[in-house]
């Protein structure tokens, strides 16, 4: 055990949080970050580079939409937003440079539910990782990794944190 070197890099309580959220999700490891927006940003930036492409459900949280539609394009990453009510829209939107498919377990704000297993099958057919925001679903209701997700993100400010009194985000793989 290396001990607590510098709190910004890691600390014992952060490590416990990461391990427990990863265990709840059925993942290998977790990374706690400052916010849900940071979790999504880190997940996308880890997978994409300038010239890459993302396919995303169009029924997603507004902040995530803004990240994908306005922020990432400034870095050369584009996104095609698809109507998730027709699952073949995901496959039709895939390009040679597509690096991720993104959905939410429960669409925010409409609470629509996407057939995650089917979207995962499409993603994996093309060897593309499926990133799932499980903020509203929580591992209490659904564990996306068990349904084919490769990366799960949370805004821990919502249900994981309890009452919105703390700010945080988590990435699980």
Please state what every model-predicted region is.
Residues 29-173:
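Conserved PLP-enzyme active-site core in the AAT-like
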Residues 1-23, 28:
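A glycine-/small-polar-enriched, mobile loop at the entrance of the PLP active site in fold-type I
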């Amino acid at each position: 055990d290396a001990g607590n070197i510098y709190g910004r890099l890691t600390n014992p309580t952060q490590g416990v949080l990461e391990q427990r959220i990863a265990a709840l999700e059925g993942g290998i490891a977790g990374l706690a970050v400052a916010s849900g927006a940071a979790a999504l940003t880190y997940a996308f930036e880890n997978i994409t580079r300038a010239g890459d492409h993302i396919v995303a459900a169009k029924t997603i949280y507004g902040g995530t939409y803004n990240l994908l539609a306005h922020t990432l394009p400034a870095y050369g990453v584009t996104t095609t937003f698809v109507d998730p009510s027709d699952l073949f829209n995901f496959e039709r939107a895939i390009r040679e440079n597509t690096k991720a498919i993104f959905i939410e377990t429960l669409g925010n704000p409409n609470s629509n539910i996407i057939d995650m297993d089917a979207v995962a099958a499409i993603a994996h057919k093309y060897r593309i990782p499926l990133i799932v925001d499980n903020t509203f679903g929580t591992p209490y209701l659904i564990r996306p990794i068990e349904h084919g997700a490769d990366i799960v993100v949370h805004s821990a400010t919502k249900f994981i944190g309890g009452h919105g009194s703390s700010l945080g985000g988590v990435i699980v793989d």
